[in-house]
Amino acid sequence: MAERKLLEALNGRTVFPPPIWLMRQAGRYLPEYRETRKKAGSFLDLCYNPELAVEVTLQPIRRFGFDAAILFSDILVIPHALGRDLRFEEGAGPLMSPIQANEIPGLDPNLIHNRLQPVYETVRRLRSELSEETALIGFCGAPWTVATYMIAGRGTPDQAPARLFGYRHPKEFSELLDTISAASADYLIRQIDEGADAVQIFDSWAGILDETSFDQWCLRPVAEIVRRVRERHPNVPIIGFPKGAGWLYSRYRQQTGVTALGLDWTVPLSEASRLQAEGPVQGNLDPMRLVAGGQALSKGVEDILSALGGAPFIFNLGHGITPETPIGHVEAMIQQVREGRL
């Protein structure tokens, strides 16, 4: 069997035109997703219903033929599986009770699998339904980003509650990160056991930290996840996405040991090319260029292909696709990437 295109790139081979998939490619910009979401009831019900989660994962594959499917789930299923309450409210996003320092020792990463069984079933079904050419990506949130929601109880603009908690309660915060790391590593291992070809670690709030905190709260826990996953699955590629890491991207790769770097759209292409000399990169089109379409889109795609297409590379956005993105713009982008038009 020929190797899946995404895996070729992740294993260090230059593929042109490059493989393409999009973060949040199963989402509200698709009418078929919105219909399935209505059937599910709540967002969490959708995540935990294997039949519907498989359906929404496959929808962008059927429509666009991306080179990879990414499991439909959410990074916050880990705190939910650790016993924290979780709900999603329209317009407010995820909400949970803020965790207190004295509650952290009671979290047991060994208890997550009962609640996450439906997710593992989704992965198993997806691998059986996807074509041989289409890779399946599993994922988790990075411990720092997951912890920010557990401490604040919701998303906040600058993650001040989590930063303050970490400074005031360093011992308890380190314990929380260790617990999330252990749970996340086991979660990824199980996804790989069920058929995931590669995994991605999303650290959406990595860019909010100072250098010392980045080392302690971002690098150290992710390195532990990578170590544990590699013990069980040494050859499965791991993509790290520390959004906003700026000049610390290179340190992130070196100290965590991830296979590939996901780059956000603020990384200059000259710097992306330098990072690519160290290993595969993924990214990094500004999602607003995809919303805008036209010359803004075609120029963005052209610049990225020209700068990064000559070495191991996966075309993606620099963050998730937004709900207002026109489907026609996605189709135009895919066509330009697949034609390799510079």
From Swiss-Prot:
Instruction: Name the predominant localization.
Output: cytoplasm
Q: What catalytic reaction does the record list?
A: uroporphyrinogen III + 4 H(+) = coproporphyrinogen III + 4 CO2
Pfam families (UniProt xref): URO-D
Broad EC category? lyase
A GO biological-process term: protoporphyrinogen IX biosynthetic process from glutamate
Q: List the disulfide bonds.
A: none
- PROSITE patterns per the UniProt record, alphabetical: UROD_1, UROD_2
One Gene Ontology cellular component annotation held by this UniProt entry: cytosol
> Is Iron set as a keyword in this record?
no
Which residues are annotated as site, described as Transition state stabilizer? D74
Keywords, comma-separated and alphabetical: Cytoplasm, Decarboxylase, Lyase, Porphyrin biosynthesis
GO MF terms listed in the record are: uroporphyrinogen decarboxylase activity
Q: In which pathway does it act?
A: Porphyrin-containing compound metabolism; protoporphyrin-IX biosynthesis; coproporphyrinogen-III from 5-aminolevulinate: step 4/4
The family database entries (HAMAP family) matched by this protein are listed as: URO_D
Q: How does it assemble?
A: Homodimer.
Q: What's the family?
A: Belongs to the uroporphyrinogen decarboxylase family.
Purpose? Catalyzes the decarboxylation of four acetate groups of uroporphyrinogen-III to yield coproporphyrinogen-III.
Q: Which PANTHER family match?
A: METHYLTETRAHYDROFOLATE:HOMOCYSTEINE METHYLTRANSFERASE RELATED, UROPORPHYRINOGEN DECARBOXYLASE
Q: What is this protein called?
A: Uroporphyrinogen decarboxylase
Source species: Chelativorans sp. (strain BNC1)
Output the lineage of the source organism: Bacteria, Pseudomonadati, Pseudomonadota, Alphaproteobacteria, Hyphomicrobiales
